[in-house]
């Protein structure tokens, strides 16, 4: 199963009591704030969940797998996510419980 933004909005509707429009707007605003922070070059730290950070990747040589031709992969910034230890532990516990 995949958790979507629509699922998150439904959960806010059911568990918090927001109307569907408010719930959808809140989810959209949350992700928009994360996107804007990353675009501005800021890290995003969500306590107990994890960190979104920007990382600079240097130019490096690459290879076309079909032709074997060497092509440069340009330098770029990428978004990385590092799960918090708390999140990792919870997922590990849930996975360990499911396999027994």
From Swiss-Prot:
One Pfam family this sequence matches: Bac_DNA_binding
SUPFAM superfamilies: IHF-like DNA-binding proteins (SSF47729)
Gene Ontology CC terms: cytosol
Superkingdom of origin organism: Bacteria
Annotated signal peptide: none
Coiled-coil positions: none
An MF annotation (GO) of this entry: DNA binding
Keywords, comma-separated and alphabetical: DNA recombination, DNA-binding, Transcription, Transcription regulation, Translation regulation
GO biological process terms held by the UniProt record: DNA recombination; positive regulation of metabolic process; regulation of DNA-templated transcription; regulation of translation
Function, in words: This protein is one of the two subunits of integration host factor, a specific DNA-binding protein that functions in genetic recombination as well as in transcriptional and translational control.
Complex and partners: Heterodimer of an alpha and a beta chain.
Family as reported in the entry's similarity comment: Belongs to the bacterial histone-like protein family.
Stored HAMAP family: IHF_alpha
Name of protein: Integration host factor subunit alpha
Organism: Methylobacillus flagellatus (strain ATCC 51484 / DSM 6875 / VKM B-1610 / KT)
Organism ancestry: Bacteria, Pseudomonadati, Pseudomonadota, Betaproteobacteria, Nitrosomonadales
This protein's encoding gene: ihfA
């Amino acid at each position: 199963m995949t958790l979507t933004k629509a699922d998150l909005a439904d959960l806010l509707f059911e568990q918090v009591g927001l109307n569907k429009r408010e719930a959808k707007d809140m989810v959209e605003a949350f992700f928009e704030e994360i996107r804007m922070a990353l675009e501005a070059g800021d890290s995003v730290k969500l306590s107990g969940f994890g960190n979104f950070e920007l990382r600079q990747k240097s130019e490096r040589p690459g290879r076309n797998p079909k032709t074997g031709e060497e092509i440069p992969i340009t330098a770029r910034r990428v978004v990385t996510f590092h799960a918090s230890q708390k999140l990792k532990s919870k997922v590990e516990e849930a996975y360990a419980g499911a396999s027994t």
